[in-house]
From Swiss-Prot:
<dbReference type="InterPro" id="IPR005720">
    <property type="entry name" value="Dihydroorotate_DH_cat"/>
</dbReference>
<comment type="subunit">
    <text>Monomer.</text>
</comment>
<dbReference type="InterPro" id="IPR005719">
    <property type="entry name" value="Dihydroorotate_DH_2"/>
</dbReference>
<dbReference type="GO" id="GO:0006207">
    <property type="term" value="P:'de novo' pyrimidine nucleobase biosynthetic process"/>
</dbReference>
<feature type="binding site">
    <location>
        <begin position="332"/>
        <end position="333"/>
    </location>
    <ligand>
        <name>FMN</name>
    </ligand>
</feature>
<dbReference type="InterPro" id="IPR050074">
    <property type="entry name" value="DHO_dehydrogenase"/>
</dbReference>
<dbReference type="Pfam" id="PF01180">
    <property type="entry name" value="DHO_dh"/>
</dbReference>
<feature type="binding site">
    <location>
        <position position="154"/>
    </location>
    <ligand>
        <name>FMN</name>
    </ligand>
</feature>
<dbReference type="GO" id="GO:0009220">
    <property type="term" value="P:pyrimidine ribonucleotide biosynthetic process"/>
</dbReference>
<keyword id="KW-0472">Membrane</keyword>
<dbReference type="GO" id="GO:0044205">
    <property type="term" value="P:'de novo' UMP biosynthetic process"/>
</dbReference>
<dbReference type="InterPro" id="IPR001295">
    <property type="entry name" value="Dihydroorotate_DH_CS"/>
</dbReference>
<feature type="binding site">
    <location>
        <position position="311"/>
    </location>
    <ligand>
        <name>FMN</name>
    </ligand>
</feature>
<dbReference type="GO" id="GO:0005737">
    <property type="term" value="C:cytoplasm"/>
</dbReference>
<feature type="binding site">
    <location>
        <begin position="76"/>
        <end position="80"/>
    </location>
    <ligand>
        <name>FMN</name>
    </ligand>
</feature>
<dbReference type="GO" id="GO:0106430">
    <property type="term" value="F:dihydroorotate dehydrogenase (quinone) activity"/>
</dbReference>
<keyword id="KW-0560">Oxidoreductase</keyword>
Amino acid sequence: MYQTVRPLLFRLDAEDAHHLTLRGLELASGVPLLPRLARTLTVPGTQGPGDAALRRTLWGQTPSEQTFESPLGLAAGLDKNAQAVPAFTAFGFGFVEVGTVTPLAQSGNERPRLFRLPEDEALINRMGFNNGGTAAMHARLAVLTDRAAPVWVNIGKNKVTPNEDAAEDYRKCVRALGDLADAFVVNVSSPNTPGLRALQAADDLAALVRAVLDEVEAGRVRTLRRPPVLVKLAPDLHPADFEASVGAVLDAGASGLIISNTTLSRGGLSHPNREQAGGLSGRPLTDRSTELVRDAYRLTRGQVPIVGVGGVFSAEDAYAKLLAGADLVEVYSALIYRGPGLVREINAGLVKLLERDGVRNIADVVGQG
């Protein structure tokens, strides 16, 4: 069905099509029982045997423990304001990452700021953290009392906040959403907020992560919860800087890594939109992000979970990242090109790959490639 609708959507400006689709998903999310019923058709095992094959538990035996019915999640950026979480979980995602959210609402960069590269199965965006702020997100998350999957919140700083004060913006996000977020993702790697990537420098990153963790601990008295804190890194770091940043994340006590954000690289692209400024996502990142996952797994020695994201268009792509060391994987750009049915396709494909390799649970392939 999506392949019939896609040509119509692709006639629209990319951001207009995004808003139209998201509005439809928001309306579907509000239909009682519909998202949960749809989920029984999209998550392997909800209707029959072998339902444990894709199930993962991370941060076990701690206040941060979470269970995922599938290792496949929605990457941040598609549902910036948590408008359609029930619909996305109905697709079959094992978790949903919303945001990036900043303490105050902001409009982001000027349009046009989102571009398709169909021949390359890629997107370029320079959105600039456009979002409705933490208060609006809190109101939306507060009504999701019966969540089918964990909801992670990707947090950032407002554009007007200088880097020396950035930690307070991240703390404000945690303070505002700590009672509702199942995890926080510290975004210091978007290329579309001036100076943001400088916060990936090891010393600055360690200080920022500690500030976020301090806020999480301070909130435990009020919320009785301790959501894990993950850090999302860029794919464009020099290898030595990447190693230093990963080490800083570990030393500061973060709970995991997301590898990786969009890239500024333009190698091998054919579409004219390759000249647009912004972060590139999609198929061109498939191999690069998988290699970075492998590097991160080697550097961390499997001490913390890794989420692999970048160019996941098939079960084989997801499986490659798991073999490289990812515990979970995320998709975004592939949804634009393949549609929501891709989620079920990847889930079912992962089950078949496990059966082919004689593996009972997805956890047993992590880091084995």
